[in-house]
């Protein structure tokens, strides 16, 4: 769990997301409260529950990215789910309980990867020994004598060559774990856990068996390292730690929550929409979900719901769900200045990405300040005239702007391109001004 203070968390989020100070502040406080709660003694600690967040704002302004970056900072199990994927119990579709089951799967996978990293060096040594045993088999015994061991200096020479990659392309016969049996099982929605259990039974049928395969040493070393690492970690500990991480630090991002908000008192599809909201209630309030790794309590999982709320209003959500999302944050639409910052100031800004991509073909891409300003203005104008898709508009505009150079890059004599305002206007101004073209091309 991170011990960063809220200002430090916001500063870290600023490296990747432009603006949206209110939303960053809200999630930073929520993350810090996780740490604060851990310092409180029982029995009061178990009474302190996270304050769930409702983010309201148009698409492409950073709602999802804020939650995703927050989960990375916290090193916490994180899942992003569209609320529209789920249906009321009794209807055809996915059950909301699968959110927690999927989160548990993610936590186990992440925990296993972390555990394998800690034993990677020992696993690599063991894998090298097995490869060397195959390369340098001991001499066969004569009569009752023991087999003669290989000279240690010879073994060390081969180990050195192995580590330097000189033997990677040589083929050897090596004993590796046989691949587990796999069976693709199709089942009706809502029975995902049953299919997972049946698949697990099939996989266990072939577990523990080994077979001799002819492989290149480079491939064999990787396969054996993974096999040895899996043998060195305690899988039961990994699963128990994953369940604890989900219960104490899990973050669920519920996107498109406005799409399940009922916009009228009518019947029809709204029945199922309200049903999804009612099914979400116990999950958000705190309940116990059965998973294949054990029972998971959702009392201390942080839920961040988000939606554009173009057609519906937050008040259209059922009152019980509104009460369980006490912190509301409104995200602003992006301005021309925001677009400029997105293009140049974030850690992995678009300008840097395209410069790195074209540098692989030997092309130096340079952007002038007026060129970047013009790009930002065109992206903003197109958003205003057509649908506002936020920062995602920059991807479309940049692709169109650099389409020609991306196609021609690598040609002899083409090693530098300066992108200034006239260059941007020459390629994008007509498209931006004509609404019919902007709607379909940009």
From Swiss-Prot:
The keyword Methyltransferase does not apply. GO terms for cellular component: HslUV protease complex. Belongs to the ClpX chaperone family. HslU subfamily. ATPase subunit of a proteasome-like degradation complex; this subunit has chaperone activity. The binding of ATP and its subsequent hydrolysis by HslU are essential for unfolding of protein substrates subsequently hydrolyzed by HslV. HslU recognizes the N-terminal part of its protein substrates and unfolds these before they are guided to HslV for hydrolysis. NCBIfam families: hslU, PRK05201.1. A double ring-shaped homohexamer of HslV is capped on each side by a ring-shaped HslU homohexamer. The assembly of the HslU/HslV complex is dependent on binding of ATP. This is ATP-dependent protease ATPase subunit HslU. It comes from Aromatoleum aromaticum (strain DSM 19018 / LMG 30748 / EbN1).
């Amino acid at each position: 769990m991170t011990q960063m203070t809220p200002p430090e968390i916001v500063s870290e989020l600023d490296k990747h997301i432009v603006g949206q100070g209110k939303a960053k502040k809200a999630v930073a406080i929520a993350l810090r409260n996780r740490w604060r709660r851990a310092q409180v003694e029982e029995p009061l600690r178990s009474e302190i529950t996270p304050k769930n967040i409702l983010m309201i704002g148009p698409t492409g302004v950073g709602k999802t990215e804020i939650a995703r970056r927050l989960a990375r900072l916290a090193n916490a199990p994180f899942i992003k789910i569209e609320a529209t994927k789920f249906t009321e119990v009794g209807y055809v579709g996915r059950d909301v309980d699968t959110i927690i089951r999927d989160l548990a799967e993610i936590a186990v996978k992440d925990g296993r990867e972390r555990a394998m990293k800690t034993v990677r060096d020992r696993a690599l040594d063991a894998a090298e020994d097995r490869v060397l045993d195959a390369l340098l088999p001991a001499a066969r015994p004569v009569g009752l004598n023991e087999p003669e061991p290989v000279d240690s200096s010879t073994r060390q020479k081969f180990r050195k060559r192995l580590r330097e990659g000189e033997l990677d392309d040589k083929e050897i016969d090596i004993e590796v774990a046989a691949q587990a049996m796999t069976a693709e099982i199709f089942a009706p929605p809502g029975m995902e856990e049953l299919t997972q259990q049946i698949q697990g039974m099939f996989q266990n049928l072939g577990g523990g068996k080994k077979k001799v395969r002819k492989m290149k040493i480079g491939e064999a070393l990787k396969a054996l390292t993974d096999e040895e690492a899996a043998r060195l970690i305690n899988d039961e500990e990994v699963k128990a730690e994953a369940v604890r991480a989900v219960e104490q630090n899990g973050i669920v991002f519920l996107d498109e929550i406005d799409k399940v908000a009922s916009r009228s008192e009518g019947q029809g599809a709204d029945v199922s929409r309200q049903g999804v909201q009612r099914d979400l209630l116990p999950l958000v309030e705190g309940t116990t979900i059965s998973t294949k790794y054990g029972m998971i309590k959702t009392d201390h999982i942080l839920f961040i719901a988000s939606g554009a709320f173009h057609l519906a209003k937050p008040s259209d959500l059922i009152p019980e769900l509104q009460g369980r999302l006490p912190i509301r944050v409104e995200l602003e639409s992006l301005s021309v200045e925001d677009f400029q910052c997105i293009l140049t100031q974030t850690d992995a800004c678009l300008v840097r990405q395209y410069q790195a991509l074209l540098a692989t073909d030997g092309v130096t891409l340079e952007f002038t300040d007026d060129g970047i300003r013009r790009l930002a203005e065109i992206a903003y104008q197109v958003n205003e005239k057509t649908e506002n898709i936020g920062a995602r508009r920059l991807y479309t505009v940049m692709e169109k702007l650099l389409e020609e150079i991306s196609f021609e890059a690598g040609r002899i004599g083409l090693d530098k391109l300066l992108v200034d305002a006239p260059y941007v206007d020459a390629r994008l101004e007509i498209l931006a001004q004509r609404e019919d073209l902007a709607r379909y091309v940009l």
